[in-house]
Amino acid sequence: MTPSPPPITYISIPLPTNDVVSRSIHNLTTAISSHRPWSELIFSGDFSLPESFSSLLLRSKTNFNYFFVNYTIIVSTCAAFALITASPVALIVVGAIIALWLIFHFFREDPLILWSFQVGDRTVLLFLVLASVWAIWFTNSAVNLAVGVSVGLLLCIIHAVFRNSDELFLEEDDAINGGLIGSNLR
């Protein structure tokens, strides 16, 4: 009997903080660039009332999945406009906190290294939560931020409910079955 080889494991090589931030920013720009064309969101497709409640749910789910990045941009823009009305300082502070969340939590792939120590995910999350609470308290912008996000969500929900999603295809199989593209398999 031969001894079994040791299991193959993935070992993460710590990267400097600059590399972590630049990779996170690259991931963020890649995610934002995956939005659907704005003309497709607004002008193409007809708007109508859903025929039934199940049709409403299906239409909403399809539109939310298809236009997710666009809807995120709309909600973020409404929140930014609400913060501008509060004060420019609030917009800058909350914008900086949102940038920290995007870079250090949502789009970070590698461990964060500060002063030759690896910072754990829970520590990063705790710091981001505390910084967010401090920023909202410091700028007194909780109400304005809630109003802006609510208006953005309301706009997205209205669009998702009334935009006909019959011609939207989320996957290639759906496009083939719907007759949008032909299949080479015969």
From Swiss-Prot:
Described function: May be involved in both secretory and endocytic intracellular trafficking in the endosomal/prevacuolar compartments.
Protein name, as recorded: PRA1 family protein G2
Membrane-spanning intervals of the chain: 66-86, 87-107, 119-139, 142-162
GO cellular component, one term: endoplasmic reticulum
Assigned protein family: Belongs to the PRA1 family.
Compartmental location: Endoplasmic reticulum membrane
Example GO biological process: vesicle-mediated transport
Domain of life: Eukaryota
Keyword set, alphabetical order: Endoplasmic reticulum, Membrane, Transmembrane, Transmembrane helix, Transport
Chief place where the protein resides: endoplasmic reticulum
Tissue specificity annotation: Expressed in roots and trichomes.
Membrane topology: Multi-pass membrane protein
UniProt xrefs under Pfam families: PRA1 (PF03208)
